[in-house]
Amino acid sequence: MLILNGFSSATLALITPPFLPKGGKALSQSGPDGLASITLPLPISAERGFAPALALHYSSGGGNGPFGVGWSCATMSIARSTSHGVPQYNDSDEFLGPDGEVLVQTLSTGDAPNPVTCFAYGDVSFPQSYTVTRYQPRTESSFYRLEYWVGNSNGDDFWLLHDSNGILHLLGKTAAARLSDPQAASHTAQWLVEESVTPAGEHIYYSYLAENGDNVDLNGNEAGRDRSAMRYLSKVQYGNATPAADLYLWTSATPAVQWLFTLVFDYGERGVDPQVPPAFTAQNSWLARQDPFSLYNYGFEIRLHRLCRQVLMFHHFPDELGEADTLVSRLLLEYDENPILTQLCAARTLAYEGDGYRRAPVNNMMPPPPPPPMMGGNSSRPKSKWAIVEESKQIQALRYYSAQGYSVINKYLRGDDYPETQAKETLLSRDYLSTNEPSDEEFKNAMSVYINDIAEGLSSLPETDHRVVYRGLKLDKPALSDVLKEYTTIGNIIIDKAFMSTSPDKAWINDTILNIYLEKGHKGRILGDVAHFKGEAEMLFPPNTKLKIESIVNCGSQDFASQLSKLRLSDDATADTNRIKRIINMRVLNS
């Protein structure tokens, strides 16, 4: 929790502390495109509800950029399509909307001609006329109104997006928010969002920096390049103290507004020492990256020399905080830099008190993501320096058991027939065997070590305070008559030789439902993130768990309907509750 001394109660009512990234995140499972992904939130104060929706996104199919390979922080933009080659920068080009969908010109009618000529927007008059052409996505899903404005005097062009929720977005109004050919300013490839305003007069203003030659060795292959095309997100200002219905950029290129919040993207201008709080105003020129690269897909060079080193959240409440610019949160980004390819390897969140005191950091050290495919087979890319959060061998064994090893292991423990070849392959792949043709003693020892690792991984998980769990069994088979008798004798103590799977949330339908009551100190553990089937909320017990039969309620008895109604049945319960023949109440014995 962020604590800022000196806030007035009125100010506190307006501010929500920044949402800090959580540690221990993992790459998501690959979707239908086979790509892994992860999202890292930025330290953005929520204001009164209208704040920038920005985050760092990783995709294993992503290219290089200001956050290293695979990472991006995309703002709303409209771009010329390059799917059919280099744009011609005329009416033959296709435009891509903010969602990546191809835009088509809206049909012109007598009541709604398209295009039209405009001299004003609302009460704001312009010094020149604009030709305004309406566009819409080829496949409609967002239901926004999109207008392309082209100046009839100076040729400046920008986009205006009317969102379905009433918010107005202005993209590329000034040259600072347009990615254009330095040798032909009218050849604009991308228009970046520059300002947004809600119907209530709340604004967000985006500032960008153009690439230059600061701290770049301009000799060798860097000589003679025009590197001014690239735009880097620099600041996002929001929380205007005085509401305003109209866009500020209609009348001014740099709005002189009292902003309460500023999100700063720093490229090394303010220093990256975690012990020194950065200043709001840049102190130095930005740093140059070791692996500069260029893009040419728009027909001109877009050269990138920068890495975003940190993201800073500032509050501007001079009366309450005693200073004009107060740093409250900081996302410090660390890279594995080298001349071949730079990777983001760690992210640390630091929060600050009102007096500049730095609170304990929140570290996000993540395993290395799968790198994008490299052309030409093997790469000379140096070994990654990602700060890897190692999983113990015991947790790895437990995770594999949950995913696919449970069947073989439990059959082996119960003395049932099991696929021996599959068991050997599992032990070999998990490095418990060194050969696929072990002796009987080698196989037995390897299985013993593997099972012990699973049990140790289980015991390392946190204890829980659950008092009842459920389990479904299928006992109404002639071959299981002895087992059924064992389970239906009150006072019997059952010893399950295998790992026993239960759930505190649901009882899965079978002919026998076990209500298993727990005492403090039991050895069952919720698998949580280790579980493969997370929807089951599985609680697993180690082998040789003892269960004492306390009571049995058979179908048709007076108490059966009452007990059945109290069960937390699984989703398929409504379809086939009459499969349940008995409910057995039992208790786990800890000794």
Curated annotation (Swiss-Prot):
Domain TR mART core per the UniProt entry, residue ranges: 373-576
EC number annotated for this UniProt entry: 2.4.2.31
Active site: R471, S501, E538
Note: In Salmonella spp. the spv gene cluster is encoded on a highly transmissible plasmid.
Similarity comment: Belongs to the SpvB family.
Role of this protein: Mono-ADP-ribosylates eukaryotic muscle and non-muscle actin on 'Arg-177'. ADP-ribosylation prevents the polymerization of G-actin to F-actin, causing actin filament depolymerization, destruction of the cytoskeleton and cytotoxicity. Does not possess NAD(+)-glycohydrolase activity, unlike most mART enzymes.
Name of protein: Mono(ADP-ribosyl)transferase SpvB
